[in-house]
Regions:
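Histidine-centered active-site loop/cap adjacent to the catalytic His
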Residues: 2-54
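A short glycine/threonine-centered beta-strand motif
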Residues: 47-76, 80-84, 107-109
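Aromatic- and glycine-rich beta-strand/loop motifs that create alpha-glucan
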Residues: 88
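A surface-exposed beta-strand-loop module
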Residues: 91-113
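Mixed-charge, low-complexity segments
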Residues: 108-112, 133-155
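Short, aromatic- and glycine-rich surface loops/edge beta-strands on solvent-exposed regions
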Residues: 113-120
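Short acidic/polar inter-strand loop motif in beta-rich domains
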Residues: 120-137
Length: 155
């Protein structure tokens, strides 16, 4: 995609992903599989330098994505703030891990943040390259997670 338009294959994939939702919502079809994107339910400090994000389904994350010879790390796609202003602080994550429906963020600082954002920009930071990953996706359906902006981190 070019940041706005998809190729034929992209629109075909979009149709394949939306069909189960339309079938459920407009035609009362039942499904035995998860057909929705992962949605963040809770964010809390689970340790002195650890934040846990809990989603509504099992997830997986891409730890890195290489584009034009540059590695883009998932841990650099999260932003934090100390107050209710827009989160802008990044590069404070030592490592990430995921387990079932959770992402565990290990911080490299003792600072306590109030809010967190995972909202990839149209372009990678400080580039004109369209964002193409890394992603958070559903483990069983491979649908990209809903981004979240300025979510409170519970103590």
């Amino acid at each position: 995609h070019d940041g706005c338009h998809f190729s034929y294959e992209g629109y075909k994939e979009f149709a394949n992903r939306i069909l189960p939702l339309v079938s459920r919502d407009f035609y009362d079809e039942n499904t035995s599989s998860i057909i929705t994107p992962p949605q963040l339910l809770n964010t809390y400090y689970s340790g002195k330098k650890e934040i846990t994000l809990t989603f509504d389904q099992k997830i997986k994350i891409e730890f890195e994505y290489e584009h034009n010879g540059l590695k883009h790390l998932m841990k650099d796609q999260f932003f934090f703030s100390f107050d209710n202003r827009k989160p802008f602080i990044n590069k404070v994550i030592e490592k990430l891990e995921f387990k079932n429906d959770q992402i565990i963020i290990h911080l490299n600082t003792n600072q306590k943040f109030l809010n967190i954002t995972w909202l990839p920009n149209k372009d990678y930071l400080n580039t004109n390259d369209v964002y193409n990953g890394p992603w958070i996706t559903g483990l069983n359906n491979n649908i990209g997670a809903l981004s979240f902006d300025n979510r409170s981190i519970n103590k």
